[in-house]
């Protein structure tokens, strides 16, 4: 990565601005998944160990109007972070700017940390955070001593005041360890993979993944397709899909992708189908690709798992984005488990999960430690897989 990293700058005695991704699920004031907080710890600890004074910025959820602030404060995150670091985390509820914040920042000593309230509280008045208001970026930059560390891969595909805005107003904008790792794993896998390179794409919509499929058809040796988007590809070939999910307006796109894939695009050959999505009374496997009338496909079937297992044999690089079925329901998680088993058993494989639902599947089903890398960013990893430049990364200082 040709950008400066946190190890390239002198931190001692400096007020260091850090964009982290603490956009974690909070229910009734309790954090239900702290993975993103844990992922940011190496960078935060490094800054504190080097004698820096860390000023952290993050958003939490979407905030469009005053009422949306309810339950969106970073207060539970400040408490959780303090417990993880074993030290006090300064935090002023509801405050994203002003004299009180400035006084707290200026009172910081070496090795101390302050968390600014949810950056999207600034969106209530004209979307200042989300639209990268130049004055806001300049103001937040003024709180520090010219160093900005971006460690929020999850928002690197957005040009917001708290990443791109601050970057434009500091002497040095550098990558944190998490951002550095994310780029190293995902970009390296796509641009310079050890072969065979197999990509696996699931999820419900073809429309979300068109750019990714097109880019990976050029880069990968094989692209396996599962999940709900299977049925748009099936219908495009005239295969019966019953009541399965389909994007009628993407049938031509699916057909075109199949035609230009030169056999690289590998589809399921059977499905696990049910007579309803939720309150079903009958679940069975299809004989072949076709879904029975009145049924909908909710997972790939055993023949497909075997086919994908064979396609993955000998793979040296695997990138996976999107589950094979409705994995949250035990009745429809066999496909996702089967594909994970097929990936992790390959000797010497570099296996990368591109965030979102696939990351949740790996973590919830006990496979997290079996993969080389699990991305913390859904949208950002998708854009990297698509070959796009990420604004948050582009804004960092060149080496």
Swiss-Prot record:
Gene3D superfamilies given in the database record? Phosphoglycerate kinase, N-terminal domain
Instruction: List the keywords (alphabetical).
Output: ATP-binding, Cytoplasm, Glycolysis, Kinase, Nucleotide-binding, Transferase
- Specify the pathway: Carbohydrate degradation; glycolysis; pyruvate from D-glyceraldehyde 3-phosphate: step 2/5
GO CC list: cytosol
Cysteine disulfide partners in this protein: none
Q: Where in the cell is it found?
A: Cytoplasm
Among the GO biological process terms of this entry, one is: glycolytic process
Query: Catalyses which reaction?
Result: (2R)-3-phosphoglycerate + ATP = (2R)-3-phospho-glyceroyl phosphate + ADP
Give the GO molecular function terms. Answer: ADP binding; ATP binding; phosphoglycerate kinase activity
Q: Which InterPro entries match?
A: Phosphoglycerate_kinase (IPR001576), Phosphoglycerate_kinase_CS (IPR015911), Phosphoglycerate_kinase_N (IPR015824), Phosphoglycerate_kinase_sf (IPR036043)
For the ligand (substrate), the binding residues are 21-23, 36, 59-62, 120, 158
Q: Where does ATP bind?
A: 209, 297, 328, 355-358
E.C. designation(s): 2.7.2.3
What family does the database annotate? Belongs to the phosphoglycerate kinase family.
Quaternary structure annotation from Swiss-Prot or TrEMBL: Monomer.
This protein is called: Phosphoglycerate kinase
Species, as recorded = Streptococcus thermophilus (strain ATCC BAA-491 / LMD-9)
Task: Identify the gene encoding this protein.
Answer: pgk
């Amino acid at each position: 990565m040709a950008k400066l990293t946190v190890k390239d700058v002198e931190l001692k005695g400096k007020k260091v601005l850090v964009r982290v991704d603490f956009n974690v699920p909070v229910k009734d004031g309790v954090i239900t998944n702290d993975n993103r907080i844990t992922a940011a710890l190496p960078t935060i600890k490094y800054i504190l160990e080097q004698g820096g004074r860390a000023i952290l910025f993050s958003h939490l959820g979407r905030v469009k109007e005053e009422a949306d602030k309810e339950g969106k404060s970073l207060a539970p995150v400040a408490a959780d972070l303090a417990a993880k670091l074993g030290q006090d985390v300064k935090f002023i509820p509801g405050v994203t700017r002003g004299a009180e914040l400035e006084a707290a920042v200026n009172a910081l000593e070496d090795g101390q940390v302050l968390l600014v309230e949810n950056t999207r509280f600034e969106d209530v008045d004209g979307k200042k955070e989300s639209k990268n208001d130049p004055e806001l970026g300049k103001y937040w930059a003024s709180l520090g001593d010219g160093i900005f560390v971006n460690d929020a891969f999850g928002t690197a595909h957005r040009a917001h005041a708290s990443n791109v805005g601050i970057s434009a107003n500091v002497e040095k904008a550098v990558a944190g360890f998490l951002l550095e790792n994310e780029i190293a794993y995902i970009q390296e896998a796509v641009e310079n993979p050890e072969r065979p390179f197999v990509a696996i794409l699931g999820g419900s919509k073809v429309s979300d993944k068109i750019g990714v499929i097109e880019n990976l058809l050029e880069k990968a040796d094989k692209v396996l397709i599962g999940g709900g988007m299977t049925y748009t590809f099936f219908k495009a070939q005239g295969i019966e899909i019953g009541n399965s999910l389909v994007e009628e307006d993407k049938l031509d796109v699916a057909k075109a992708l199949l035609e230009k894939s030169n056999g690289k695009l590998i589809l399921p050959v059977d499905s696990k189908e049910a007579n309803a999505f939720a309150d079903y009374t009958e679940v069975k496997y299809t004989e072949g690709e076709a879904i029975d009338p009145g049924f909908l496909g909710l997972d790939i079937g055993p023949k497909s798992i075997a086919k994908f297992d064979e396609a993955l044999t000998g793979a040296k690089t695997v990138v996976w984005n999107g589950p094979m079925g409705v994995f949250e329901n035990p009745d429809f998680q066999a496909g996702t488990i089967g594909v994970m088993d097929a990936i992790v058993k390959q000797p010497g494989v570099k296996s990368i999960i591109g965030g979102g639902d696939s990351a949740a599947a790996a973590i919830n089903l006990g496979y997290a430690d079996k993969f080389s890398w699990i991305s913390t960013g859904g949208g950002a990893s998708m854009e990297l897989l698509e070959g796009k430049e990420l604004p948050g990364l582009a804004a960092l200082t060149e080496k």
